[in-house]
From Swiss-Prot:
Pathway: Metabolic intermediate biosynthesis; chorismate biosynthesis. Catalyzes the transfer of the enolpyruvyl moiety of phosphoenolpyruvate (PEP) to the 5-hydroxyl of shikimate-3-phosphate (S3P) to produce enolpyruvyl shikimate-3-phosphate and inorganic phosphate. Phosphoenolpyruvate binds at residues 22, 93, 122, 170, 342, 384. It catalyses: 3-phosphoshikimate + phosphoenolpyruvate = 5-O-(1-carboxyvinyl)-3-phosphoshikimate + phosphate. InterPro entries: Enolpyruvate_Tfrase_dom (IPR001986), Enolpyruvate_Tfrase_sf (IPR036968), EPSP_synthase (IPR006264), EPSP_synthase_CS (IPR023193), RNA3'P_cycl/enolpyr_Trfase_a/b (IPR013792). Belongs to the EPSP synthase family. The active site is at residue 311. It is found in: Cytoplasm. One of its GO terms (biological process) is aromatic amino acid family biosynthetic process. Its main location: cytoplasm. This is 3-phosphoshikimate 1-carboxyvinyltransferase.
Length: 429
């Protein structure tokens, strides 16, 4: 396991590019694998999770060429096949959930999907129950609603599927990507309020690019039947979740940084980081395709509803530590179901640095202390915690040692190099 050694940094300066969007890359490569013909995914995220989707799609029959030099993936899709081995999707929950549904459309036999320790704890039962309503046989090998998942080849029957909206939006994305294969139109009815709605907006956006028509209804969505995915050339935009660490660093530290490849009209929910730091008092400049930050700024605590932005929780928690007054994060029960229990992890680890932070069932209360001290932190193999805690370490007195640096390969493989290029005092050991 690698350690990240982070020391207090007085100045950040430079122009950097936000890494490509993880959410868009996943959906683009899976959609392209379902399209009959050749698609090009341009500027994809070369992160471990998205490469898990590449691996899973290859196992299900797609021919995918990865061209590092041109920074594009060429995908020849359209013909699903029965995999000749178990599909190991590593640490990618998105891959597991979307491909569980897609695997039902193989021509014969079974597909088995599994992953690492963290993945084998993630809830899958709501999706398995939904698939059962559509005559699809998919079950947990342990019969406890978690991976390994065994999926039987089968035709979709039925025109209504009911599913909860408050556990994971990935279940709904999975159904949306499957149901164009149904011969008839299908209504997805949400039986509880939808959380992480912006991720569904991303799914709708990319499915529309592939020629798939889905309408919103009063209580869910209507997916039209007998549709075909069309091959496309698709350029992946920058990722606001990953950029949130760069934005937080610029806001907290004396800085002059420009983050390119961030589009003001993006459908990503995590674009909310812009309004969050502005509301806290950071006068950052937002252009059509970039963000300019001239920090540092005096921040004040605010209340943040994280129902739709679970991935921003670690970033907001760190910002709250350095803000005047109280920052409250609420509506985040689902944040406990990520790579780790992120609410607990933020509370436990930031306390080691001297933070005044209190855990609640659905969030965190942080009282700004303005100063943190270096400490040795555990990140529970969670990429977002590695990056958020790095930003805390850049502002803290002394040296912060962060375990599990390699986790950043999931969403922001060159995070350390990008931070160093801005002048961050960090090294990997």
């Amino acid at each position: 396991m690698y350690l990240l050694i982070v020391k207090k940094t007085d100045r950040l300066e430079g122009i950097v590019k936000a890494p490509p969007s993880k959410s868009y890359t996943h959906r683009a490569v899976i959609g392209a694998s379902l399209a009959d013909g050749v698609s090009r995914i341009i500027n994809p995220l070369w992160g471990a999770d998205c490469l898990s989707s590449v691996h899973g799609c290859r196992m299900l029959g797609a021919n995918i060429e990865l061209d590092k030099e041109k920074d594009e993936w060429i995908v020849k899709g359209g013909e699903l096949k029965t995999p000749d081995n178990i599909i190991d999707i590593g640490n990618s929950g998105t891959t597991l959930r979307i491909l569980t549904s897609i695997a039902s459309q193989i021509p014969k036999g079974y597909a088995i999907l599994t992953g690492d320790d963290s993945i084998r704890k993630r809830p899958m039962q709501p999706l398995l129950d939904a698939l059962k309503q559509l005559n699809i046989e998919a079950f947990s090998s342990k019969l406890d609603g978690t991976a390994p998942i065994i999926v039987k080849s089968g035709k979709i029957y039925g025109n209504v599927v009911k599913i909860r909206g408050d556990i994971s939006s990935q279940f709904i994305t999975s159904l949306m990507m499957l149901l164009p294969f149904n011969k008839e139109d299908t209504e997805i009815i949400l039986t509880s309020p939808l959380k992480s709605k912006p991720y569904i907006d991303i799914t709708l956006d990319i499915l529309n690019k592939f020629g798939i028509k889905i309408d919103k209804t009063d209580n869910g969505f209507l997916v039209y039947g007998n549709q075909k995915y069309k091959p496309i050339d698709y350029i992946v935009e920058g990722d606001y979740s990953s950029a949130s660490y760069l934005i937080a660093a610029g806001v907290l530290i004396n800085s002059n940084i420009t983050i390119e490849n961030l589009f003001a009209n993006s459908k990503q929910g995590d674009k909310a980081i812009i309004n969050i730091v502005k509301e806290m008092g950071a006068d950052i400049k937002v252009k059509k395709d970039k963000v300019i930050i001239e920090g540092e700024y005096s921040l004040k605590g605010i209340d943040v509803d994280v129902k739709d932005i679970p991935d921003l929780v670690p970033t907001i928690a760190v910002l709250g530590c350095f803000a005047e007054g109280k920052t409250e994060i609420y509506n985040g029960e689902h944040v406990r179901l990520k790579e780790c229990d992120r609410l607990r992890a933020c509370a436990v680890e930031l306390k080691k640095m001297g933070a005044d932070i209190e855990e609640k069932p659905d969030g965190l209360i942080i009282r700004g202390v303005k100063k943190l001290k270096g400490a040795k932190l555990n990140t529970y193999h969670d990429h977002r915690l590695v990056m958020a805690f790095t930003i805390a370490g850049l502002k803290a007195e002394g040296e912060t040692i962060i375990e599990g640096e390699e986790a950043v390969k999931i969403s922001f493989p060159n995070f350390v190099d990008v931070m160093k290029s801005l002048g961050a005092n960090i090294e990997v050991k």
